[in-house]
Amino acid sequence: MSIPADLKYTESHEWVRTEADGTLTVGITDHAQEALGDIVFFEVQELGKTVSAGDTVAVIESVKAASDIYAPVSGEIIEANSAVADTPDLVNSTPYESWLFKIKPAADAALDRLIDADAYSKSIGA
């Protein structure tokens, strides 16, 4: 199982990458996609909306279960990955390249609540 050291993580199994312009790119971890199994559907429900950390932003469904995807920080959902919406199983084959949505963090976004790769690894018992 892969847990890239250059990303931040949430306890709810999202990975977060900070882009040069300050936006955050969000996806689900390798651990999460393994637990879900074959992913068959993905939809961002909050595109263009301002959300709080922990709010449900998207839904991802597999042959086993449906899972909510949460905002890692407060901010505005500015983009959804249409490639993943069209071909959801990309998340199974390339979970760290197949991002789900982008968020423009609010000025008071609590980025320090995100955890590093070591802490995430420990949280899943890896």
UniProtKB/Swiss-Prot annotation:
SUPFAM superfamilies: Single hybrid motif
This protein's name: Glycine cleavage system H protein
Alphabetical keyword list: Lipoyl
Swiss-Prot/TrEMBL cofactor(s): (R)-lipoate
Cofactor note as given: Binds 1 lipoyl cofactor covalently.
PROSITE patterns the UniProt entry points to: BIOTINYL_LIPOYL (PS50968), LIPOYL (PS00189)
Gene Ontology cellular-component annotations: cytosol; glycine cleavage complex
Stated role: The glycine cleavage system catalyzes the degradation of glycine. The H protein shuttles the methylamine group of glycine from the P protein to the T protein.
PANTHER family: GLYCINE CLEAVAGE SYSTEM H PROTEIN, GLYCINE CLEAVAGE SYSTEM H PROTEIN-RELATED
The keyword Acetylation is assigned to this record: no
Keyword rRNA-binding included in the entry's annotation: no
Protein family: Belongs to the GcvH family.
InterPro entries (UniProt xref): 2-oxoA_DH_lipoyl-BS (IPR003016), Biotin_lipoyl (IPR000089), GCV_H (IPR002930), GCV_H/Fam206 (IPR033753), GCV_H_sub (IPR017453), Single_hybrid_motif (IPR011053)
Domain annotation Lipoyl-binding: ranges: 23-104
Organism in which the protein naturally occurs: Paraburkholderia xenovorans (strain LB400)
Assembly, per entry: The glycine cleavage system is composed of four proteins: P, T, L and H.
Modified residues (N6-lipoyllysine): 64
GO biological process: glycine decarboxylation via glycine cleavage system
Pfam families listed in its UniProt record: GCV_H
